[in-house]
């Protein structure tokens, strides 16, 4: 039987009461997790609607009346607590159980289970953007527990809905929910990269996993090989977001439209520039919406909603980061907020801009709205950068032939730092050594914890020097060597800011010159930077340094692995 959402009269208190009672019944006997709660409520629904009053009879009834896979799922998850379902069936109505399964609360369980779903407000926004018409085929790749399909299938009698989910338990929960609330829905267990290539849809949604790289993606080899032949811009370090987006495009009809939720960084980092160029050059990006932070229960990561379709000559960029209702633990996009965002897709406003190919090309094909919407760069607790600086010098202006004469073939206590020695915000350990220097060059030495910022060229490089005692490093002339007042500001906090999208956009505003972009010292000193309390600065700086240390360890492991590869041939006798 198909149940209508509008007939359930959902009350959050009742849903909460069901969860509370389940926790009370099984406290000390089992770990209370959303899957267990859902299955117990599902079994209570079966018991109540079929007048089953015994635990063994309930398990037997389920075994005889549902699919073998579902029966196994129910027994695997809830066999030891099945009597709780009978207790619930005597306390609540079937409408209460249906409301619970429709809402399926997961927030009480933390990160792991919250990852299985999409916030309702995001599903609603995606639904409004997709504007599903009668008879259209709709897919959700990585459908989790079926949040999107359950929501958008309401009153869609003549549409076909398809879900694909690799986690068997999530898939079965999704199937239960679609059986109850969605007509013409089919949820398939499996890898989305293994979906038949000829399976096409007019509308597609995907809230795929965050923070993955191609090298970590356990996707079908055949698909990736085929994809790389078609899109050589894809590299091993490419963000998985763009691999997922490529898959979505492959399953979209010629006139179709898709919405995906992706990470902020993939819209602007240098690693993904070539694949962004491919998508933009081929007219595959219709719009990009920067979403409010803290929408998800399991992460505070900044996210982007991307609209994919074909034959686009420009891209609509919207900054909706402040268009939300702020909650204590989680932000929500209200129905009113959704309508405002929909209007911004079509109408002018301070938070929206349409950008053509040439402008995108001039901006490294960055797709983050803050790059193009100057008014959106807001700095909280802002001060002029110059007020935090003790001194600024430029590195030594050395000619190539002068430098060649100064290079030492043997280690000395003086080394030379060039721009090429700064990669991904870190200074190389293998800097060239210099012979005895003219004392006049001493003023160009870099101090410990000095902030380094490239003056010319793009993208700009930022680093914090960590110099051991007894070691001297001469800076290149294309560097600002900045000694900060560390009683006011943590250098690693400023580095983290400059490397953020907001910080990058702030730096970009003071850049002059198009052929060779450069930053003037005067403009740099007037630049507004955030200055929160030192406690918060240190917290951000510590997180940044910890992640930087993690990268160094990974780089060392990678170097060792490469060295090991060179010796494999000789190991086999």
Where are these regions (language model features)?
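Flexible, glycine-/basic-rich loop-and-beta segments that form/coincide
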Residues: 2-3, 297-381
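Long recognition/docking surfaces used for binding and targeting
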Residues: 31-110
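Conserved S-adenosyl-L-methionine
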Residues: 112-206, 211-212, 263-265, 275-276, ...
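DNA target-recognition patches
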Residues: 215-223, 403-438
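Conserved Class I SAM-dependent methyltransferase catalytic core
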Residues: 234-300, 305-307
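A short glycine-rich beta-alpha junction/loop motif
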Residues: 306, 370, 472-480, 512-539, ...
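Non-catalytic DNA-recognition/assembly elements of restriction-modification systems
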Residues: 347-409, 423-424, 531-573
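A short beta-sheet element
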Residues: 441-444, 448-499
């Amino acid at each position: 039987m198909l149940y209508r959402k509008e007939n359930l009269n959902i009350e959050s208190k009742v849903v909460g009461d069901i969860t509370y009672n389940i926790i009370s019944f099984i406290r000390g006997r089992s770990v209370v997790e959303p899957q267990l709660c859902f299955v117990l409520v599902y079994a209570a629904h079966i018991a109540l609607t079929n007048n089953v009053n015994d635990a063994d009879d309930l398990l037997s009834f389920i075994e005889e009346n549902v699919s073998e896979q579902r029966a196994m799922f129910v027994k695997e998850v809830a066999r030891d607590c099945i009597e709780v379902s009978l207790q619930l069936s005597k306390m609540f109505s079937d409408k209460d159980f249906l409301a619970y399964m429709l809402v399926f609360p997961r927030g009480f369980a933390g990160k792991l289970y919250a990852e299985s779903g999409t916030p309702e407000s995001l599903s609603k926004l995606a639904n409004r953007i997709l504007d599903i018409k009668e008879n259209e085929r709709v897919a959700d790749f990585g459908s989790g527990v079926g949040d999107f399909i359950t929501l958008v299938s309401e009153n869609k009698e003549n549409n076909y809905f398809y879900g694909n989910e690799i986690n068997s338990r999530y898939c079965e929960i999704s199937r239960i929910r679609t059986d109850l609330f969605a007509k013409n829905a089919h949820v398939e267990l499996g890898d989305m990269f293994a979906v038949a290539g000829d399976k096409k849809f007019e509308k597609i949604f995907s809230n795929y996993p965050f923070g993955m790289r191609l090298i970590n993606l356990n996707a079908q080899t055949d698909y990736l090989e085929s994809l790389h032949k078609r899109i050589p811009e894809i590299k091993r370090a490419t963000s998985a977001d763009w691999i997922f987006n490529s898959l979505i495009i492959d399953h979209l009809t010629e006139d179709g439209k898709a919405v995906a939720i992706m990470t902020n960084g993939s819209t602007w980092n240098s690693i993904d520039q070539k694949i962004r160029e491919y998508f933009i050059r081929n007219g595959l990006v219709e719009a990009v919406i920067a979403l409010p932070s803290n929408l998800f229960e399991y992460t505070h990561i900044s996210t982007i909603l991307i609209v994919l379709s074909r034959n686009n000559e420009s891209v609509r960029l919207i900054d909706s980061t402040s268009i939300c209702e702020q909650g204590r633990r989680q932000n929500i996009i209200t129905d009113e907020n959704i309508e405002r965002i929909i209007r911004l897709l079509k109408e002018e406003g301070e938070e929206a801009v349409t950008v053509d190919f040439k402008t995108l090309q001039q901006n490294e094909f960055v797709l983050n709205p803050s790059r193009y919407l100057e008014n959106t760069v807001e700095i909280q607790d802002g001060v002029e950068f110059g007020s935090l600086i003790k001194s600024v010098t430029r590195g030594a202006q050395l000619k190539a032939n002068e430098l060649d004469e100064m290079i030492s073939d043997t280690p000395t206590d003086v080394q030379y730092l060039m721009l090429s020695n700064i990669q991904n915000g870190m200074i190389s350990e293998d800097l060239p050594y210099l012979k005895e220097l003219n004392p006049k060059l001493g003023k160009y030495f870099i101090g410990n914890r000095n902030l380094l910022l490239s003056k010319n060229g793009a993208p700009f490089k930022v680093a914090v020097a960590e110099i051991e005692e007894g070691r001297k490093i001469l800076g290149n002339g294309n560097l600002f060597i900045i000694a900060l007042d560390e009683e006011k500001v943590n250098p690693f906090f400023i580095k983290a800011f400059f490397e953020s999208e907001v910080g990058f956009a702030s730096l970009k505003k003071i850049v002059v010159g198009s052929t060779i972009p450069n930053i003037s010292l005067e403009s740099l000193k007037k630049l507004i930077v955030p200055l929160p309390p030192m406690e918060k600065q240190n917290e951000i700086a510590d997180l940044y340094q910890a992640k930087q240390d993690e990268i160094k360890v990974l780089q060392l492991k990678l170097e060792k692995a490469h060295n090991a590869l060179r010796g494999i041939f000789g190991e086999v006798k």
